[in-house]
Amino acid sequence: MVLLRGVGLLRSSNVTSGGAAATASRGGNLFKCLMNAKRPDGMLVNRRGFHGSMVYKAAMSEEEASELSDVTKQLTGADLQAASKLRNIGISAHIDSGKTTFTERVLYYTGRIKAIHEVRGRDNVGAKMDSMDLEREKGITIQSAATYCSWNKDQKDYHFNLIDTPGHIDFTIEVERALRVLDGAVLIVCAVSGVQSQTVTVDRQMRRYNVPRITFINKMDRMGSNPFKAIEQINSKLQISAAALQVPIGSESNLRGVVDIINRVAYYNKGDQGEIIDKAEVPEDLKDLVEEKRALLIEKLADVDDEIAELFLEEQEPTVEQIKSAIRRATIARKFTPVMMGTALGNTGIQHVLDAIVDYLPNPSEVLNTGLDLSKNEAKVPLVPSIQQPFVGLAFKLEEGKYGQLTYIRVYQGRLRKGNYITNIKTGKKVKVSRLVRMHSEEMEDVDEIGSGEICATFGIDCSSGDTFTDGNVKYSMSSMYVPDAVVSLSIKPKSKDSTNFSKAFNRFQKEDPTFRVKFDPESKETVISGMGELHLEIYVERMKREYNVECETGKPQVSYRESITIPAEFDYTHKKQSGGAGQFGRVIGTMSPVEGETRDNLFETAIVGGRIPDKYLAACGKGFEEACEKGPLVGHKVLGVKMLINDGAIHAVDSNELSFKTATMAAFRDAFLKSQPVVLEPIMNVSVTSPNEFQGNVIGLLNKLQAVIQDTENGHDEFTVKAECSLSTMFGFATSLRASTQGKGEFSLEFSHYAPTPPHVQKELMAEYAKKQKK
């Protein structure tokens, strides 16, 4: 069976239950006991909502834990010592939740930068990690930026490789890239808005790449902030057990510090930039709240950790060390996320997050990374983060720098040395590592060697994003990143006739960003670019102007439609062509039917009995099917969710060849497709709009005008969020309409949800337009 690409497949996540629930199944009536257990403070707790019974899709499986244990046994004391001081982490969140502001404080407190600059600061310097001019102007992160810094905790220096990622859905590939190579992440959630649409997307990406996370609730100094409501949403909407490790001292504009509920200590950030931390006793008016939240934390840990569950049953209060160890185990096993709180802009609570990164996020030796051994039929092999092992690294990001192409590499195994030769597994080419650097946003620091588990960059290596490199001693390949389909296209042409830089820019952008696609449409004689949204394409058009001095004219944004069928149909097609000499002959018989299911990939199958069509011709039929799926007969867009089965046919002893059967299959495909009640599918988007409460009527009216289906509305203290499903074709220009309806105070995010049939009148119009183009 040949599986042809339709909509990208998501990697399935591991499924397991919480630790205490597992203990319950072993201990007979233990679960009943826990249902009415006592809290450490003596209060009886009704346990109907016992979280251990919940299924955490991303939790570590027993098989994964066993493989990881085998890998750890292969590490030397020196390997474990080196790994214990290293953390590879990403900063992820919904747009405007304060990721870059948070990262700026991290760099300042770790001594990496000398002064703090704001994302939209008056000094016009911009945040360190927003190195592109466009990022500083728009106040958003477009590319993920890498840096490294050191943090001293308990008289030990820890080395952080840190990646700040975009929050805008149009740049989601940057988040995918970062999470693919990171061992842990800090998820930032707004204390006012709570879990938002892109928070859910980032959570899904973290699960896809098995990334444990700690959570920081930011913007605690804003009016309407409610960290405990945000924690409830993390539990309910993200379906992962979460509990606070802190409670705030004061609220909103009176926020003065936080209380560490594990150690029962109050911390106040002092100094001009919050760099001085004063330690004090817990304020009297917060003592009850601290005990309540501490009991809740232990209760949550009992759901996901066996050791705490045992203590919980015995009505013993765990020690500080036992609580911290349990948080670490549960976080690394992806069953739990510890929650801290503060305000990045107000310089409160950031240092505690740095401590939590050390305490609770895994080092490279505590994460299972696997490759595929191409010399053993792609057998899965665990990668060992030891410098004694053969080198294996993944090129996860490309950038065009002033010294040529800059390739970011995560070293999974072995070490990478300047001057060494490494092999690109995809192309088989050997390349020399002439320069090796550590990145600090757009600045770089030269190094001679990079060890296992580290992230670096190198120059002069010709490769694509997602390529695997080894030292040539092993033929391992890393599984590639998930790349979503493009949903928006527009035609583009340079204003001047000189198109050298025009082509050069496209080649570079496509190498850098797999979600940015360029093709030439032979019918309209136009160059068409496709991407994840209007902003995504707008940024690339602007970058062409700035970086390549090419001004462009663009057409109207076009929707990437799909074509599909609704009922099965049979086909029997004979392709004959004779014009003297060798002719062409191929006959194919079979059925075409719709494919059900979430992914709706196109499938090509054969069931030929008695060799009526030889295998080499069947392979040509497969190619014909793949080619036919690239351009449907209704409106010329890709085909989705079609299964073609060839179960009979005929050949001619002289005239049959691969081309004949490829042509016959394409013609049979077209005939059967048109008989199968075909439909044009359009992208349906998840829309999330946030705006001040006084504009609620305007926003709902605007969405109704677009025939959006409203799914949910949440009213906050001073703003509301409405979630809806809407056809992408109606969303062009929505940003302008929303600005006008909310006096510029509304914001929205769009994310692809699924494909659905267009209304009949729209399908008619699209088909008529396509037929008109064909005649020209």
Swiss-Prot record:
<comment type="pathway">
    <text>Protein biosynthesis; polypeptide chain elongation.</text>
</comment>
<dbReference type="Pfam" id="PF03144">
    <property type="entry name" value="GTP_EFTU_D2"/>
</dbReference>
<keyword id="KW-0547">Nucleotide-binding</keyword>
<dbReference type="GO" id="GO:0005525">
    <property type="term" value="F:GTP binding"/>
</dbReference>
<dbReference type="InterPro" id="IPR000640">
    <property type="entry name" value="EFG_V-like"/>
</dbReference>
<protein>
    <recommendedName>
        <fullName>Elongation factor G, mitochondrial</fullName>
    </recommendedName>
</protein>
<dbReference type="InterPro" id="IPR031157">
    <property type="entry name" value="G_TR_CS"/>
</dbReference>
<feature type="transit peptide" description="Mitochondrion">
    <location>
        <begin position="1"/>
        <end position="57"/>
    </location>
</feature>
<feature type="binding site">
    <location>
        <begin position="93"/>
        <end position="100"/>
    </location>
    <ligand>
        <name>GTP</name>
    </ligand>
</feature>
<comment type="similarity">
    <text>Belongs to the TRAFAC class translation factor GTPase superfamily. Classic translation factor GTPase family. EF-G/EF-2 subfamily.</text>
</comment>
<dbReference type="InterPro" id="IPR014721">
    <property type="entry name" value="Ribsml_uS5_D2-typ_fold_subgr"/>
</dbReference>
<feature type="domain" description="tr-type G">
    <location>
        <begin position="84"/>
        <end position="365"/>
    </location>
</feature>
<dbReference type="InterPro" id="IPR004540">
    <property type="entry name" value="Transl_elong_EFG/EF2"/>
</dbReference>
<dbReference type="InterPro" id="IPR041095">
    <property type="entry name" value="EFG_II"/>
</dbReference>
<dbReference type="InterPro" id="IPR027417">
    <property type="entry name" value="P-loop_NTPase"/>
</dbReference>
<dbReference type="InterPro" id="IPR004161">
    <property type="entry name" value="EFTu-like_2"/>
</dbReference>
<dbReference type="InterPro" id="IPR009022">
    <property type="entry name" value="EFG_III"/>
</dbReference>
<keyword id="KW-0809">Transit peptide</keyword>
<dbReference type="InterPro" id="IPR000795">
    <property type="entry name" value="T_Tr_GTP-bd_dom"/>
</dbReference>
<feature type="binding site">
    <location>
        <begin position="164"/>
        <end position="168"/>
    </location>
    <ligand>
        <name>GTP</name>
    </ligand>
</feature>
<dbReference type="InterPro" id="IPR047872">
    <property type="entry name" value="EFG_IV"/>
</dbReference>
<dbReference type="InterPro" id="IPR020568">
    <property type="entry name" value="Ribosomal_Su5_D2-typ_SF"/>
</dbReference>
<dbReference type="GO" id="GO:0005739">
    <property type="term" value="C:mitochondrion"/>
</dbReference>
<comment type="function">
    <text>Mitochondrial GTPase that catalyzes the GTP-dependent ribosomal translocation step during translation elongation. During this step, the ribosome changes from the pre-translocational (PRE) to the post-translocational (POST) state as the newly formed A-site-bound peptidyl-tRNA and P-site-bound deacylated tRNA move to the P and E sites, respectively. Catalyzes the coordinated movement of the two tRNA molecules, the mRNA and conformational changes in the ribosome.</text>
</comment>
<keyword id="KW-0496">Mitochondrion</keyword>
<dbReference type="InterPro" id="IPR035649">
    <property type="entry name" value="EFG_V"/>
</dbReference>
<keyword id="KW-0251">Elongation factor</keyword>
<dbReference type="InterPro" id="IPR005225">
    <property type="entry name" value="Small_GTP-bd"/>
</dbReference>
<dbReference type="InterPro" id="IPR009000">
    <property type="entry name" value="Transl_B-barrel_sf"/>
</dbReference>
<dbReference type="Pfam" id="PF14492">
    <property type="entry name" value="EFG_III"/>
</dbReference>
<dbReference type="InterPro" id="IPR005517">
    <property type="entry name" value="Transl_elong_EFG/EF2_IV"/>
</dbReference>
<dbReference type="Pfam" id="PF00009">
    <property type="entry name" value="GTP_EFTU"/>
</dbReference>
<feature type="binding site">
    <location>
        <begin position="218"/>
        <end position="221"/>
    </location>
    <ligand>
        <name>GTP</name>
    </ligand>
</feature>
<keyword id="KW-0342">GTP-binding</keyword>
<dbReference type="Pfam" id="PF03764">
    <property type="entry name" value="EFG_IV"/>
</dbReference>
<dbReference type="GO" id="GO:0003746">
    <property type="term" value="F:translation elongation factor activity"/>
</dbReference>
<keyword id="KW-0648">Protein biosynthesis</keyword>
<dbReference type="InterPro" id="IPR035647">
    <property type="entry name" value="EFG_III/V"/>
</dbReference>
<dbReference type="Pfam" id="PF00679">
    <property type="entry name" value="EFG_C"/>
</dbReference>
<dbReference type="GO" id="GO:0003924">
    <property type="term" value="F:GTPase activity"/>
</dbReference>
<dbReference type="GO" id="GO:0070125">
    <property type="term" value="P:mitochondrial translational elongation"/>
</dbReference>
